[in-house]
Structure formats: C-alpha cells, structure tokens
Amino acid sequence: MEAPPEHCPGVESEQAGKVSACAGCPNQGICSDPNRKVEDPGKALVAESLKDVKNKLLILSGKGGVGKSTVTSLLTRYLARSCPNSNFGVLDIDICGPSQPRLLGALGENVHQSGSGWSPVGIDDNVCLMSIGFLLGSVDDAIIWRGPKKNGMIRQFLSEVDWGNLDLLLLDTPPGTSDEHLSVVSYLKDDTQPESLRAVIVTTPQEVALLDVRKEINFCKKQNIPIVGVIENMSSFRCGNCGNSSEIFPAKTGGAAAMCAEMEVPLLGSLPLDPQIAKACDSGDDITEIKNSTTEALDGICSKIMSSFS
C-alpha cells in the first residue's frame, strides 16, 4: 500500500476508506473492503526491536494534571537506584506534551543515528530515554498532529530505537484513552507473554480525577492489561514551617483507597505534594539523595512494582 494522506483515519478505523479524507487515496478501495484483513506490518518490526526488553510498564491516567509524568520520572530514578544491576528505559509517548527530557535532566541532548537505529539518550549508567522532545528545534515548538501521524511516531520509537537489553521499559503516556493508547497497546501486547505488559495508574484524591481514572481502569480491563496498582499523587501537603499536613485536594468520596476497593485493584501507595521533589524535577536533578516521607513511600511503591514482574 502507498503512503496514506495526512488526515487518514487509520486502516484499523471503522471509517477507513469512507470519509472525505480518503477521496483520491489509491488505497481507498482496499480500506473500504469489508472483507479485508488488517495486519499492521509494524507489529512484527516492533516485536523484533523489543525482543531483548523483558517487561513493559504503562504509566496511565485518565485525567491530565495528576502528575503522571512526574511520577514516571520518580519511579525511574528509584527503580534504577534500588536495582543497580538492572537496565531501565523510558519512552515518552506524550507526543504533544513531552516532559521527560526536563524531568530527567536531559534537556538539550541530541539523539544519534547508528546502524542499529536511533540511540536513546543515556540518563544514568542503567537508564536511557527516548522522547520526541529530543527531535524538536526548540522546547517551545508545538506539535500539531492528528492521530495517524502520532501513531506513526510511536511505531518508530518502538521499532527504530536501539533499546538493547532492558529489564523494564516504562512508557509515559498522555491522559485519556486516545489513539496513542490504542496504538501502543496494539504493538506491545504479546499473547505468548501477556504478563510482560502491565500498567500503573496515577490519580489525585478528588472525585473529578477519580471519575476519569475509573475509565482508565476499565480500559485496561477491556484490553486485558494487568494493573499493578494505583498511585495516589498529591495526597496531602506537609508545611515546611509548622510541620502540619493539609489536604489540598480533599478526598470527599474516600480518595484512591475507596476507588481501589470498589474496582478491585491494588493501591500501591500515596505521595504528598513535596516542594523538595518539585524543585528537583524542575531542574532535572536526581532526587534519590533526598530522605523524607515522600522518598520512603517511593521506595515501597517501587518494591511492589518490581515484585509484580518477578
């Protein structure tokens, strides 16, 4: 098949070959054939590229602004520190809002091409990162792409990056259950090793966030993706002056704990709003040297995550 038009709905869409964007496309007849069997050749390429990646972990949230990208970077730092003999990769598939280069202290780094594909950027001895943020001319450049182009970029990241031997690949996803989620799940699901792809879901305590997180949990259940558990972020705020704790986002309906009990998924732990952590993330500093209740909670959460893959 020839290259699709820019606004192609995608060969897996029910609208394939039927919408105005398909007019004049040489593949329109193929796509609109109700008897066609759609097999994305990219899936085989992804499987070959990731054959040495033991496990994959999707970091998800139905709601934007809950700190999913921040939690991804914190988990990466702590997993790498607690498992120094293991190798970790981070793939930032939040195409329109890539945050990992800043959070992991890699702003301004360049991606290099080798005979094996793109080389991800090294963060630590046992951590590497790939993000579209490395491919932009400026950190302020806007990415205005429709679904098929985003999906094509995700396929390239999965099939054309030289990830090498990884014990765990963490994928920072955009909020919701959009094209990016469907695309990455279709490429990563392996029926022969269903337990190699799992999910962690991030929320905040208030009902407006939990409402969408429930949808994300149901998305995982429908896609048969095992859920390691839920992390409640910004659960409280401890004042650095008086030491008192406050609920910035009151859990009027019981917070993540009540939701997890209702939906029968584990609660991995809770993380407070922490000015020290926020400052370190903004500057891309390693937060593993900070010792407080937040980092203690992170240690416990990371232990549960690694245990789920053993």
From Swiss-Prot:
A molecular function (GO) term: 4 iron, 4 sulfur cluster binding
Gene Ontology process terms (BP): iron-sulfur cluster assembly
GO cellular component: cytosol
Cofactor binding remark: Binds 4 [4Fe-4S] clusters per heterotetramer. Contains two stable clusters in the N-termini of Nubp1 and two labile, bridging clusters between subunits of the Nubp1-Nubp2 heterotetramer.
Residues engaged in binding ATP: 62-69
Subcellular location(s) of the protein: Cytoplasm
The keyword Nucleotide-binding is assigned to this record: yes
Family: Belongs to the Mrp/NBP35 ATP-binding proteins family. NUBP1/NBP35 subfamily.
Protein's UniProt name: Cytosolic Fe-S cluster assembly factor Nubp1 homolog
Origin species: Drosophila ananassae
Gene name tied to this protein: Nubp1
